């Protein structure tokens, strides 16, 4: 980050490392939607630095200074997150936990299916035995 002061205002030049800023804007926002990337005002950005957007203040007002400071903080945070994977560890551990829970649920469902299959086979055998018993018995004459 570079900063200078002029007329009681701080001016910052900084970068925010995020393709999210241009790739997620709708077409009507005036930002070119292309694979190369684009700056906020629509100018193309070379692939080597397509994820870098430069922010600079427009005039010496407190609002511009606050915007530049926010952009600088965002850039610093983005660089920290890119360099330090501890920000993402809880996401990875949650994903592992969800996967383990899904595997446990699938194991329980598989066991229930195996039990149902065994019960169905047993029921099929009983039905077959009853069918054989009723078809092989000689017919009894009906007397009145």
From Swiss-Prot:
One of its GO terms (biological process) is symbiont entry into host cell. Residues 106-133 form a coiled coil. GO terms for molecular function: hexon binding. It comes from the Viruses. Keywords: Capsid decoration protein, Capsid protein, Coiled coil, Host nucleus, Host-virus interaction, Virion, Virus entry into host cell. GO terms for cellular component: host cell nucleus; viral capsid, decoration. The keyword Coiled coil applies. Gene3D superfamilies: 6.10.250.3040. Transmembrane segments: none annotated. InterPro entries: Hexon_assoc_IX (IPR005641). Induction: Expressed in the intermediate phase of the viral replicative cycle. Its main location: virion. It is found in: Virion; Host nucleus. This protein is only encoded by mastadenoviruses, and may therefore play a role in mammals tropism. Homotrimer. Interacts with hexon protein; this interaction tethers the hexons together. Self-interacts with adjacent proteins. Interacts with kinesin light chain KLC1; this interaction leads to capsid disruption at the nuclear pore complex during virus entry into host cell. Three N-terminal domains of hexon-interlacing protein form triskelions between hexon capsomers. Structural component of the virion that acts as a cement protein on the capsid exterior and forms triskelion structures consisting of three molecules that stabilize three hexon trimers at the center of each icosahedral facet and fixes the peripentonal hexons. Dispensable for assembly. During virus entry, recruits the anterograde motor kinesin-1 to the capsid docked at the nuclear pore complex thereby subjecting the docked capsid to a pulling force. Belongs to the adenoviridae hexon-interlacing protein family. This is Hexon-interlacing protein. It comes from Human adenovirus A serotype 12.
């Amino acid at each position: 980050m570079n900063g200078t002061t002029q007329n009681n205002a701080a001016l910052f030049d900084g970068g925010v490392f995020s393709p999210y800023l241009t790739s997620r804007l709708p077409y009507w926002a005036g930002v070119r939607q292309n694979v190369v990337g684009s700056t906020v005002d629509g100018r193309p950005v070379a692939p080597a630095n397509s994820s870098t957007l430069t922010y600079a203040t427009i005039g010496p007002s407190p609002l511009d200074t606050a915007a530049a400071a926010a952009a600088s903080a965002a850039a610093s945070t983005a660089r920290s997150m890119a360099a330090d994977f501890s920000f993402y560890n809880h996401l990875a551990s949650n994903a592992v936990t969800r996967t383990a829970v899904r595997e446990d649920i699938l194991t329980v469902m598989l066991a229930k299916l195996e039990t149902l299959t065994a019960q169905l086979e047993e029921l099929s055998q009983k039905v077959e035995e009853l069918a054989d018993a009723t078809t092989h018995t000689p017919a009894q004459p009906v007397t009145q």
